[in-house]
Amino acid sequence: MTQQLVRHITLGALGWDRDDPVYPEDLPVEWRLAYYANTRAAVWVPAETWLGGTTPDTAAWREDVNEGFRFVVALDERHADAPGRAAIAAAIGALGEQLAAVVATAEVHSAVLGDRHAGLRVDPAAVWRGVAVPAAEVRLGIVPADRLDSPRAMREVLEAFAAAATVPAPCLFVDGPLGLLEDLDTLGRLMGVC
């Protein structure tokens, strides 16, 4: 008898720092992460976050979330030659044990982080995006909002990701309105996968 992995999909968003109907109109911008983290356990930090000259205060991020909250950080080829590589590496390092993964090619990871966090590196090609991934381990996925336009579509995405994942607790991130997360989470709990 083959034993299946027990799956509990953690749902999160591709970024939190944006205008979104989920946030109260009078919520200060600097409180968005804390507000988001009240209902979510993970966030994908997009590659654009690390560009623009000012490195984010990730120590403040850690203060805004609970100990169980996790950050998935994306880096791309733009970071390999960025003048602020050392500051980016320090900011990522400041996430400490709350850093769940660094999504980057080996070359970019090495250029920005050296050998730090090598065990957390996930190749971008290993991120599930709705189709089969030619990777030994699938623990992260991203789905665009237009793939979640009905309860049936949401169910199909959750089933496909659960089938593709190779770890007991994979993370699926939504690229779209934060309100979709609540609907997806409700359906996932009914299905027994979230």
Regions found by a protein language model. Give the residues of each.
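Residues lining hydrophobic/aromatic ligand-binding pockets adjacent to catalytic sites
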Residues: 1-194
